[in-house]
Amino acid sequence: MQTDIAIAQSAEILPITQIAEKAGLKPNEILPYGYDKAKIKLDPTISRKKDLGKLILVTSINPTPAGEGKSTVTVGLADALALAGKKTMIALREPSLGPVMGMKGGATGGGMSQVIPMADINLHFTGDFHALTAAHDTLAAVVDNSLQQGNPLNIDPRRIIWKRVLDINDRALRHITIGMGGPTSGVPREDGFDITVASELMAILTLSTDLMDLKARVARIVVGYTYDKVPVTVADLGVSGALAVLLKDAIMPNLVQTLAHTPAIIHGGPFANIAQGTNSILATKTALQLADYTVTEGGFGADLGGEKFLDVKVPILGKTPDTIVVVATVRALKHHGGVALADLNNENLTALAAGLENLGQHLKAMGRYGVPVVVAINRFSADTDSEIQAIKDYAQAFGAAAYTTTVWAEGGAGAQDLAAAVIEAADQEADYTPLYQPENEAIDKLNAIVTTIYGGLGVELSATAQKQLMAFKAQGWDKLPIIMAKTQYSFSDDPKRLGAPKDFVIHVREFVPKLGAGFLVAMTGSILTMPGLPKHPAALDIDIDETGKITGLF
């Protein structure tokens, strides 16, 4: 069986100018990055249609080590829609090097349902993440320089909340001391690193509507507090323009293609467990303006990327999904039902029935938004007909039809039934209802997410979090949308509680205000913003030969 990268390397790749033409972009509306990649210029005249196209949101059950193949289904579904004669585009996030070299892998799909050039996209791509890292760390350097140069803003070094970032999983950098080496080496203080995708700049990049909106959002970033506990912003430091300059190319969406030559826009990459987990507003909006159907996805499960797409991205995008597709696999559901990874290839209808409760909670959560929901069963070779039918019957009880897909092996041809169902569902009248209103109190928003989306009892705030909320109310920040930073493996904040637990509360240990992005991050459980490498990182399996051919990259 060929690896994903072997399939990608043997594929015919069309010139990016040809893909742009297929998408409806004129030659002067793109900036080619070589033969097979391009930036799409920020041009308000790109819109070719009076009405935006249909928006299909792909999400999934809680991920497991068994794999769900959400990105693979996303790509395969788009190719299937194209096969059905629909003008289709994909809008995905960019992969982070941390997981690529760590344990999760890339974000370009798999098998015959991939976006290409796969290796380039999973590695440095067009340099967006490097530009973002440089901008973020420039701001960090400016903060420390202000301390060194007499501290004119009266910044309290103990209350600086702007860490440094790196797009690599490196647990040793979570907590560090900087400014050592004497008076000429800066002011000593505690600091740390987050992974680049956790940067507020990444959230801003993906939520900005244009370059000036990005610059205005950057100016609102809070980097820390004075000795009098007054917020210090980028506007106070005077570098919003410089940071916007560093991001002027990164804000432009990236155009590539699938193996079947469906145009794909890949842009932005916030994780859904520590940020909003969606691709950029600009990428999605551009695709909607050009195509009849745009297929996009939310990171991790519907409890994270799905909820954040619907409650954080949709109000800015100004377009609700026309259909939500929830991806599930027999293997993952059996794992949620208690089956060990080594035994997932064996039929086990009892465990599957127990694990189906995880799917059920996601269907209830997505169904409450008033958008038609369809289930995609990503079929593996060991799945039995009885197991597949059990999922279909279960989903039907929630009013959601389920369809098997074999897109890894067959590409778009393996999702034709799913595509037909999505087309039919997208023609239904959606009645989108947000989970909460902007004027709701933060605690009410938190409880709505936990009780309605997660199926839990509510939230419990630490003393620190309670104190922060009181301070935020005084600042007028308490009505901002909520981003839950939570484990992706469970509805609860305990990654070991699989399935669909009910008797749990979510423990919020602290909040992180992200005024530039426009939300409050609720840090729950033991979630981290700088991952570590596993015992056997993926980097150990990646190699390159004398011809430049890469191996081991999935």
Curated annotation (Swiss-Prot):
It comes from Leuconostoc citreum (strain KM20). Coiled coil: none annotated. One of its GO terms (molecular function) is ATP binding. ATP binds at T64, P65, A66, G67, E68, G69, K70, S71. Belongs to the formate--tetrahydrofolate ligase family. It is an enzyme of class 6 (ligase). The keyword Ligase applies. Keywords: ATP-binding, Ligase, Nucleotide-binding, One-carbon metabolism. One of its GO terms (biological process) is tetrahydrofolate interconversion. Pathway: One-carbon metabolism; tetrahydrofolate interconversion. It comes from the Bacteria. The gene is fhs. It catalyses: (6S)-5,6,7,8-tetrahydrofolate + formate + ATP = (6R)-10-formyltetrahydrofolate + ADP + phosphate. InterPro entries: Formate_THF_ligase, Formate_THF_ligase_CS, P-loop_NTPase. This is Formate--tetrahydrofolate ligase. Its EC number is 6.3.4.3.
